Curated annotation (Swiss-Prot):
Gene inactivation effect: No visible phenotype under normal growth conditions.
Name of the protein in its database record: Cytochrome P450 78A7
Membrane topology qualifier: Single-pass membrane protein
Keywords: Developmental protein, Growth regulation, Heme, Iron, Membrane, Metal-binding, Monooxygenase, Oxidoreductase, Transmembrane, Transmembrane helix
Length: 536
């Protein structure tokens, strides 16, 4: 009885306190509020129950437009599968869900009010990525706030986006442009090798990540802005730039509940996204505008064929001429995207070589045979074609550790899309491809958990630039990564030099851990620490 009285008092308190919090002291309003709450709960449960496969965002039969229904988990009312995917490693969770339900072709689920499908099978993945009806991307709140909706990655499919793509493909990522900046990549690599040697001699081991990140930053800054940073002489400027890039990574890679439950953004912002974006954007504008202004003054006579990418953008005229805000957005995206994948892919590759010394030895023998020792100079871009085992090692790393396991950024259907399996994906659906699931599927790859570069040697070699969806880490179709060739050239050169110059072994006080953390890309959770022995 005492417990019942206590419960009654608690109930009475909340019946008065809740409406009072909304500005009411009328008990009639209390019952009205209660009825409204119960009605919302009831309708949410009914909607969820009737939605069927895929959950609440697939209500009204959205998953049954074709002759074959799209299967998938219901999740829970209102939230769908948000709680399942908002923590941990989403690519592994989705793969486990698809494999356990035999839904590898395609699986529907709900992220709040957002209908989502994920493909975990190469043929359906190809249909999605190659379809012109999936050429758009859903724009996250952070991407819009950080100006990415006016850059190549997130700009909607149309005249403006095609123009940006053409400019980048012609003036930054074309083979002749990549070759023109070879000397800069060679310089970045030489500085990294020197820094690795200094750290090993001073500390007895090397944490590779910071050296890779600096080299990646200087690589993209050199080709895009025509400048590089000395970590000692320009420490303040370098710290500011790396701080901005790191903050951008965190904001764009963070799971923002308001992207899927828009009403939540009015009163809940757990990561302070709006405030942090508002603080970061002026810093970006100041940095990039300063560089643009410097180019306007000092490079007014420089031709686009011999200048950097800023010179190219400033030289454009007519329909191709960009407004300054658009130019800032495009250049900021180049910095942002260019400093991520190359560094983390190289770190994953070196970690696997530390764990597989036989592979490391075979790779070093190939490099020394084709290129020679230190007396013959550094590895050149022209040498990379003579190193098939090196290319196989990088491809196998991309298979085991795709930097964008869900291809980083999803696609958005602009109309109903009929697939070959009889399913129809409705207009307005967010589409993902789980590349990690495909590259770890034993029906696609033999012994998929084993690091085995031999699977890419000889006649078993394959195109990884979007032609074969068994391994397409850079995507495919209209939204394939435009910088894939530059990125691969950079990573293979770095790995070649690091293996040629040093022997890499485990630090027994901190063994290599291949645990993952999924941010904007999939990184090593614990940075690689190794003991290196200088060869020459």
């Amino acid at each position: 009885m005492e417990l019942m009285n206590l419960a009654s008092k608690e109930t009475s308190y909340w019946m008065i306190a809740l409406p009072a919090g909304f500005g009411s002291q009328n008990l009639h309003d209390v019952s009205t509020l209660g009825y409204l709450f119960l009605a919302v709960v009831f309708l949410s449960i009914v909607t969820w129950a009737l939605a069927g496969g895929g959950g609440v965002a697939w209500k009204n039969g959205r998953n049954r437009l074709g002759r074959v229904a799209i299967p998938g988990p219901r999740g829970i009312p209102v939230f769908g599968s948000l709680f399942t995917l908002s923590r941990g490693l989403a690519h592994r969770t989705l793969a486990a869900m698809a494999w356990s339900r035999a839904n590898t072709e395609i699986m529907a689920f709900s992220l709040g009010s957002t209908p989502v499908i994920v493909a975990s099978e190469p043929n359906i993945a190809r249909e999605i990525l190659m379809s012109p009806h999936f050429a758009d991307r859903p724009v996250k709140q952070s991407a819009k706030s950080l100006m990415f909706s006016r850059a190549i990655g997130f700009a909607p499919n149309g005249t403006y986006w095609r123009m940006l793509r053409r400019i980048a493909s012609t003036h930054l990522f074309a083979p002749r442009r990549i070759l023109a900046h070879e000397a800069g990549r060679q310089l970045d690599c030489a500085e990294m090798v020197k820094a690795v040697s200094v750290e090993q001699n001073g500390a007895g081991s090397v944490v590779l990540r910071k050296h890779l990140q600096l080299a990646a930053l200087n690589n993209i800054m050199g080709s895009v802005f025509g400048r590089r940073y000395d970590p000692l002489a320009q420490k303040e400027d370098l710290d500011e730039l790396t701080s901005m890039v790191r903050e951008g990574f965190e904001l764009l890679g963070a799971f923002n509940w308001s992207d899927y439950l828009p009403w939540l953004g009015y009163f809940y912002d757990s990561i302070r996204l709006n405030q942090r974006c508002s603080d970061l954007v002026p810093r970006i504008r100041t940095l990039v505008k300063k560089i643009i202004d410097e180019h306007r003054v000092s490079n007014s006579e420089k031709k686009r064929d011999i200048g950097d990418f800023v010179d190219v953008l400033l030289s454009l005229d007519g329909d191709e001429k960009l407004q300054e805000d658009d130019m800032i957005a495009v250049l900021w995206e180049m910095i942002f995207r260019g400093t991520d994948t190359t560094a983390l892919l190289t770190e994953w590759t070196m970690a696997e070589l530390v764990l597989n010394p036989n592979v490391q030895t075979k790779l070093r023998d190939e490099i020394l045979t084709a290129v020679g020792d230190g007396a013959d100079g550094d590895v050149a871009d022209a040498d990379l074609a003579k190193l098939p085992y090196l290319n196989a090692v990088v491809k196998e790393t991309l298979r085991l550790h795709p930097p964008g396991p869900l291809l980083s950024w999803a696609r958005l259907s602009t109309s109903d899309v009929q697939l070959s399996n009889g399913m129809v994906i409705p207009k307005g659906t967010t589409a993902m491809v789980n590349m990690w699931a495909i590259t770890h599927d034993q029906t696609v790859w033999s012994d998929p958990l084993k690091f085995d570069p031999e699977r890419f040697t000889g006649n078993a070699d394959m195109d990884i630039r979007g032609g074969d969806l068994r391994l397409a880490p850079f995507g495919a179709g209209r939204r394939v990564c435009p910088g894939k060739n530059m990125g691969l050239a950079t990573v293979t050169r770095w790995v070649a030099e690091l293996v040629r110059r040093f022997e890499w072994g485990q630090d027994q006080t901190e063994p290599v851990d291949l645990g993952e953390v999924l941010k904007l890309s999939c990184e090593m959770e614990h940075p690689l620490r190794a003991v290196v022995t200088e060869i020459f």
